């Protein structure tokens, strides 16, 4: 049972990390969009204020999206049976959890399951085929 709970805990951490990575990617995209829009706005007279406003709204929406992805990940984990809905924390902020996960060292290295090897298997030699004329 302890192994099962550890597996669920690792799955929860994975869901949280995935949600944070998604949020981080969207936030970075919003920042780049903001930079691009501000550059274009600086070349066009009279629209800089409106452009900055649009860029800031884009950044805010990226933050909201990250939170939605986090709660959606919890719903997916519950629907697949990985965790019970009531076990999934609802009061966590994705950015806080991801920061904690990044600061904690990995207790034990990830290992391959016994008997399984992920190395490339040797490829068979093939004879070249030459069609008859």
Curated annotation (Swiss-Prot):
One GO location term (cellular component): synapse
Post-translational modification: Phosphorylated. Phosphorylation by G-protein coupled receptor kinases (GRK) is more efficient than phosphorylation by CK1, CK2 and CaM-kinase II.
Reported function: May be involved in neuronal plasticity.
Gene Ontology molecular function: calcium ion binding; cuprous ion binding
PTM annotation (Phosphoserine): residues: 45, 117
Entry keyword annotation includes Cytoplasm: yes
The protein, known as: Beta-synuclein
Sequence segments annotated as region (4 X 11 AA tandem repeats of [EGS]-K-T-K-[EQ]-[GQ]-V-X(4)): 20-66
